[in-house]
Amino acid sequence: MEQFLLSLLRHIAYNFPQLSLVAEDCGQLDTQEDNYPVTFPCVLVGNTDISWSDLDEQGSSQRGTATITVRLAIDCYDDVHIGSTQESSIADRYRLASELHNSLQSLEFEDLPDIYPLSRQRSRDYTLPGNIKIYESTYSFLISS
């Protein structure tokens, strides 16, 4: 699983050089502390959850249905009300979120044959204090061990 997470982070960082940070989600956005400063725009990946089932009677082989959450965080300091001349920032944010999803949907890694392609299960957007807009998607995939 750790190789999958590293491969996913590398894929995002390589395909989205405009991101200032691509990292495992360790709660960086949920704290007011400056110990681990977050720069924007960024993508944080984590909150993995796997439900396992045995493929044989001995339990030596298993298949799991996993989910992982990808959060794109963007600083929305710009005044984006209609007539503000910054209205295009809204479209730019949604475009980046869409491009990120398009790069992840059906993503598979040749060097990880036990990980099956990603499939988006849900998405939402919300705002954190400090004008930080979050575009969050949860992807599912199968994993064998």
Label for each model-derived stretch:
Residues 1-37, 48-145:
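Charged, amphipathic alpha-helical segments and their flanking helix caps
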Residues 41-45:
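A short glycine-rich, His/Asp/Glu-containing loop-to-beta-strand
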